[in-house]
């Protein structure tokens, strides 16, 4: 996988993610579908910050999750979610810009409290823990939006609320 391909792949998903976060900023941030679930605001912040993790995968040979905080921040406003996401995107782009392709094939290890959990190439780590992880939680967030009776953006095709393409015209 090349750095150029990875950047294009990430950017395509970031565009869709921004559309979901644009809607989420107007949602009741404290709402939760279940007591065991994140609040909508906390889930949106998690989605917003994930792109910044690209830095951890392009620097050093490992990352220890046990050294982190207590999970996503609780936002005070929708504007904070969008600002966090914009900063995360900037950090992701900076981490990937100028990155040599061979660096992406180097080994990288995810750990928790010093215990290795998974070892893979940097490219696979970014694909799995940034891109696919963001897409997974973005999908959860679209369900939250639907349950709050907010419009779900068209992402890969039309949604029940938004058309991705204009309607076809009769010939």
Kindly label every feature range from the protein language model.
Residues 7-22, 26-71, 110-171:
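Short, contiguous alpha-helical
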Residues 1-4, 40-49, 93-100:
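Short, mixed-charge, low-aromatic patches
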Residues 104-106:
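Active-site-proximal loop and beta-strand segments within enzyme catalytic domains
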Residues 2, 6-10, 77, 81, ...:
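Residue-level preference for long, well-ordered alpha-helices that form the structural scaffold
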Residues 94, 98-102, 143, 147-150:
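Alpha-helix capping at helix-to-loop junctions
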